[in-house]
A protein has these predicted regions:
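Secreted glycan hydrolases and related glycan-binding modules that recognize and/or cleave
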Residues: 22-376
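Bacterial N-terminal signal peptides that target proteins for export
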Residues: 1-9
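C-terminal motif of bacterial Sec signal peptides marking the signal peptidase cleavage site
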Residues: 17-21
Length: 376
């Protein structure tokens, strides 16, 4: 890892005063953002830190409203040093409050926000509602037939050219949606082995076509600076490992992880969740790059898990802790830097004291500053 310069150390030191000394702003209504509380120099340092090489902090944010008496439902309430947030639900038809909330965090804090939903088949999530509302009167035999016709999915699936054109049309529409709302990229939730199957994810070749089209506009091959992430089961795309070149990060749902050995297995040599990421992508991308791209995440949907920092976890030296802390302390056994850590339903941790206590601690563990980010 490159050494963080004095600028970044200053940024992280300033975070202490904001999180600990000026934490009252987190109780404000979302309509009163804290632009006046911190200096331009602080925010410049914060944005510079996020451009540096480091293990990132990530989260899926749900129940977003952008307003309310408390900031649990606002992006502005997320700790400043979180790098990437995937919007889980409530991502369309943005209100003025949501737009203001999103733009403040993007432009001032430098946080990047990705649209996220489960990918199964062509049309998922973005087929116009009128297609579903009018299929009978238009003479289709089923709702699915109407959806397929809208996207150009052929009745004869042996027509590979038509299949590819349909997939690319759908992927292009997702990019248009991202640009419409001003998100910073897309997080593909890919979980075909957990009941989320369809004509894209059932076939590695179709999945490759889908990602290739996205990759023209998102991810490291696009040159746009926009993000392309894949979460869920990226290790399962075994027949097309070259797909890995299109992604910025692999986000692994290492929920209720028992310890370092579990994380090493998910990354390196496989286990109960299938092959390790390196088994799938190592030859194509190299072991170091795969490791640098890997973000391990814990599930905070359960209130107890959010309040406590996850589940019991034991590191390779026999030390016991909670799982989010364990993920932050985890050093992959291959010796390379991990991509980072994160939480699902990160907003559920807002009720800790200070807010997002466990995620802040994880950030401090991975990227220590000269001062603690929170009071222990």
């Amino acid at each position: 890892m490159k050494k963080i310069s004095l600028l970044y150390t200053l940024c992280l030191s300033l975070l202490t005063s904001i999180f600990v000394g000026c934490s009252d702003w987190t109780d404000m209504e979302a309509k009163s953002f804290p632009e006046e509380i911190t200096s331009d120099e602080y925010y410049a340092a914060l944005r510079a830190y996020k451009q540096s090489e480091h293990s990132v902090a990530f989260g899926w944010f749900g129940n977003w409203t952008g307003e309310g008496a408390f900031m649990k439902s606002s992006l502005a309430g997320i700790p400043d040093s979180v790098d990437i947030v995937s919007i889980w639900g409530n991502w369309s038809n943005l209100s003025e409050a949501k737009i203001k909330d999103l733009r403040f965090c993007q432009e001032v804090k430098g946080t990047r926000f990705t649209l996220c939903f489960i990918i199964t088949a062509v049309g998922t999530q973005i087929t116009p509602q009128n297609v579903y509302d009018t299929w009978e009167e238009k003479g289709y035999s089923s709702e699915q037939e109407a959806v397929n016709d809208f996207w150009g999915w052929p009745k004869d699936e042996s027509d590979k050219e038509a299949v590819e054109a349909s997939i690319r049309k759908y992927a292009s529409a997702i990019v248009d949606t991202i640009n419409k709302y001003g998100y910073d990229g897309f997080d593909i939730d890919y979980e075909p082995n957990y009941g989320n199957r369809g004509n894209i994810v059932n076939d590695d070749n179709n999945m490759f076509i889908f990602v290739d089209e996205l990759g023209k506009h998102l991810g490291p091959k696009s040159g746009t600076g926009k993000l392309l992430l894949i979460d869920g089961e990226p290790q399962s795309i075994k027949t097309r490992p070259e797909i890995g070149h299109y992604f910025d990060y692999f986000v692994i749902q290492a929920y209720n992880s028992s310890g370092d050995s579990n994380l090493d297995g998910r990354l390196i040599n496989g286990g109960g969740a299938g092959p390790g990421l390196i088994q799938t992508y190592g030859e194509e991308l190299g072991e170091e790059r795969v490791t640098n791209m890997t973000i391990m995440t814990e599930n905070f949907e359960a209130v107890d898990a959010a309040m406590n920092g996850g589940y019991p976890y034991t590191d390779r030296y026999g030390n016991s802790m909670m799982s989010l802390e364990g993920m932050a302390r985890w050093q992959p056994s291959n010796g390379f830097r991990k991509g980072g850590v994160g939480t699902y339903h990160m907003e559920a941790e807002y009720g800790t004291s200070p807010e997002y206590k466990n995620l802040r601690k994880a950030i401090q563990i991975m990227n220590p500053s000269s001062h603690s980010l929170l009071k222990y």
